[in-house]
Amino acid sequence: MKLPRRPPRRWLLQLGAAAALAAAGLRPVAAQPAAPTTPATPPATTPASPPPATPPELTSELPGARWRGTGVLRFLGLHIYDAQLWSAQAVSGDGAAQPLALVLVYARQLVGEQIASRSLKEMSRLGRVDDEQSARWLKAMTQLFPDVRDGDRLTGVQRPGVATRFFLNGQFRGELVDAEFTRLFFGIWLSPRTSEPRLREQLLGGRS
């Protein structure tokens, strides 16, 4: 006796999909004739994004500060933070001689000790840091840099040749009075030798 021919696998899959749709109260839509092709409409031009609001801590720390640029730091594809550069005058070179502020708005949770150790590593790339400086700066940054989470804002204000002042979400954390620390710390983002040249270009408003 001949057995009935087994329906093709493609039919079985179609029947299974139809049954699943029916169980969910849905019906497959019949195919519609293709609409006549029309010339593609060019996409609308997206207006430039408005500048971010001035962080409250800069009102007294950096009078007349203006937003200069914003850049995004990613690591292995992960969004780490958005960086903003603020100053009263346009920033030139590495900005070491100018009062300015860097604002980091974090996009994920990070441990303060990790932020401190990474900062020291980047600073050591830009200039000679001896053992005494390394130990002192790491200790200070570990105390100044808290654990952060998505949305936290960490602000560093540069007082050229004098000190760096730190704020978390507008609250003063403390300062490190050390001209060389200040130069190398802000050099992480603004030195021509930064490890993130694209981010530097974005912060400077497209100028290198």
Language-model-detected regions and their locations in the chain:
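General helical structural elements
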Residues: 9-14, 31, 204
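Bacterial Sec-dependent signal peptides at the C-terminal "C-region" and cleavage site
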Residues: 26-32
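N-terminal secretory signal peptides
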Residues: 1-7, 14-26
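Terminal leader/tail segments of proteins
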Residues: 2, 32-36, 46-208
